[in-house]
Regions:
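N-terminal ordered "arm"
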Residues: 7-66, 79
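Short alpha-helical segments and helix-capping/turn motifs at coil-helix boundaries
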Residues: 30-32, 41-46, 66-71, 89-92, ...
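Short loop/turn segments at secondary-structure transitions that flank enzyme active sites
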Residues: 65-67, 90-92, 111-113, 185, ...
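Hydrophobic, aromatic-lined core segments that form the binding pocket/scaffold
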Residues: 148-396, 409
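N-terminal accessory interaction module
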Residues: 44, 54-55, 60, 66-98, ...
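N-terminal "leader" segments that precede or initiate the main folded domain
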Residues: 1-6
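Cysteine-cluster motifs in flexible loop/terminal segments that predominantly coordinate metals
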Residues: 395-424
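Compact, glycine/acidic-enriched structural inserts
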Residues: 82, 86-144
Length: 424
């Protein structure tokens, strides 16, 4: 209820009857103020006329007036600058810390707004606002998707910053860890990130010129060289090499091989293949992050990250069992997903870190130039009448689903705002 009161106040969706305080003084809302997302009153710098006198200050909203006391505002001088207490139910008078009476307004939510809000909250259909999407003005759609895209960029930049802190601000390491996670393509994403974060990068770097030794490091630390398969010569060689590297660098125990999931995976996405591709890439590109950040075009980046494998994996998806010869290269779709989920967020985050707008703009341009992702979220929105053309669109819709639709947070959504206005 309080969220709905916030919405009605913020957008000045008032009934036609004049507003007045519970003591009968007329109220004119010139500016409802700025929503405060931190501690303190709910709206800052509101501009109101109460009984003909202009007031500028803060506004606090509650479902019930008595919430003022439950929250301790009557003992908190921070709330002494509240010029109006807006409530859904006026069950008592409220007071400042100095004992003065706080002007109070009983705000009624229009029935049609409440009904539409209940529709959005209770429907099982996704997206809940499907009935208005096709009729929304293009400018409304474009501006909201653009804002969501920036919001998603900023969230991913924060996640990268958190990884940087854990990795002593080593951009190359964090880029590789994020790349590894995204090569898990969802099902094995957590396992790949945990494995990559567990890698002794400086030890691996000492043997980076040898693809065989990098593979031994990667597969061994992934817990995939723990069994005794005498019949596979390449496996035995990798295992022997890994045991040598373990002793040389006093490596910590590998992650558990049980972390890796194979069910419902296409063989090309098996962990062994992805680890072999990462090993090849780590061996080939000794300054991977730096090269990617310096690349001018998306096609140049694809050439840099276009990984293959050592010859053994051209006839294997796992150890022991051979398969028909096939080069295990990253396909076009996989490269696009790596661009969308790894490279482009890093361009943006690195641009923010260096205050380099050129990198941030490049990230946006790359995203707008790539085709939209084809997944269940984009298909649902497209089916509801919202065109999805570029990766910028699809990333914005993923943000919308995660941060708004799944949380039923329609009051902060611009599509939800249009729905509540009655555009049906």
């Amino acid at each position: 209820m309080e969220q709905l009161l916030h919405y009605v106040w913020k957008h000045k969706i008032f009934l036609l009857m004049p507003l007045q305080t519970t003591s009968g003084q007329p109220v004119e809302v010139i500016d409802p103020g700025l929503l405060n997302t931190d501690a303190g009153p709910d709206f800052f710098n509101a501009k109101l006329k109460i009984n003909g006198t202009l007031w500028v200050g803060n506004v606090e909203l509650h479902t019930q007036a008595s919430d003022w006391f439950r929250h301790g505002h009557n003992r908190d001088t921070v709330y002494d600058n509240v010029i109006l207490h807006v409530v859904g139910e006026s069950d008592c008078e409220v007071y400042y810390a100095n004992g003065g009476i706080v002007p109070q307004l009983l705000l009624h939510c229009p029935d049609n707004v409440r009904q539409r809000y209940d529709e959005l909250r209770q429907t099982e259909i996704y997206p809940p606002c499907y009935s208005i999407l096709a009729s929304l003005p293009k400018l409304t759609v474009h501006s909201w998707l653009s804002a969501l895209q920036v919001e998603r960029f900023e969230q991913k930049a924060q996640a990268i910053a958190a990884r940087l802190e854990r990795c002593n601000n080593h951009w190359e390491d964090v880029f590789f860890i994020t790349l590894a996670r995204n090569l898990g393509f969802g099902l094995n994403g957590d396992a790949f990130e945990a494995w990559a974060a567990h890698l002794p990068f400086r030890a691996v770097d000492k043997h980076r010129d040898s693809l065989f030794q990098v593979e031994a490091f990667f597969l061994g630390q992934a817990g995939l060289l723990e069994e005794d398969w005498q019949e596979d010569c390449y496996y035995r060689e990798l295992q022997k090499e890994f045991h040598y590297l373990q002793r040389k660098f006093e490596l910590s125990a590998p992650v558990s091989g049980d972390w890796w999931r194979f069910l419902r995976l296409r063989p090309g996405n098996f962990p062994h293949v992805r680890l072999a591709q990462l090993a090849w890439l780590y061996h080939k590109e000794q300054s991977l992050f730096s090269r990617v950040m310096a690349a001018e075009t998306a096609e140049d980046i694809k050439k840099i990250i276009s990984a293959r494998t050592s010859p053994y994996w051209e006839t294997h998806f796992t150890f022991k069992k051979s398969s028909p010869h096939q080069e295990k290269r990253l396909g076009e779709n996989a490269l696009n997903l790596i661009l969308i989920n790894t490279v482009i967020p890093f361009l943006y985050a690195y641009g923010m870190h260096r205050a380099d707008e050129r990198l941030c703009d490049r990230a946006t341009c790359f995203l707008e130039a790539l085709k939209a992702e084809n997944n269940h979220v984009t298909r649902l929105w497209s089916g509801a009448g919202l065109p999805v053309y570029t990766a910028a669109d699809s990333q914005a819709l993923l943000q919308l689903q995660k941060e708004y639709c799944d949380r039923k947070d329609c009051l902060r959504c611009r599509f939800g705002y249009e729905y509540l206005r009655g555009k049906k």
